[in-house]
Amino acid sequence: MKRVAFVFSSAPHGSAAGREGLDALLATSALTDDIGVFFVGDGVFQLLPEQRPGAVLARDYIATFKLLSLYDIDQCWLCADSARERGLDPATPWVVDVECLAPDALRARLHEFDVILRF
């Protein structure tokens, strides 16, 4: 089976990309066990706790990220530099357990996957 990576690089609630990526991620988990999830660039905002999407009339899909472990999706990485560039501490209590990596280490992990889907 091919190894599939999901890369979240867009901010939540401004577009449907994050929600669609999460839906695709959960659907793919029924087909393969070898899934990696990466949060880079503005995608690090996907994992911030205590978001209030209702204020912009958006659906709260962020809570669904907490279900990843129920789908046996436990390979999750976050770009530490992306977090810092956006004024976030990589040690933030994210909504998902992620391993914070430097860009080079993150890139090396990403190259281990056969298919890369970006949202």
From Swiss-Prot:
Its main location: cytoplasm. GO terms for cellular component: cytoplasm. It comes from the Bacteria. The keyword Transport does not apply. Part of a sulfur-relay system required for 2-thiolation of 5-methylaminomethyl-2-thiouridine (mnm(5)s(2)U) at tRNA wobble positions. Belongs to the DsrF/TusC family. This is Protein TusC. It comes from Klebsiella pneumoniae subsp. pneumoniae (strain ATCC 700721 / MGH 78578).
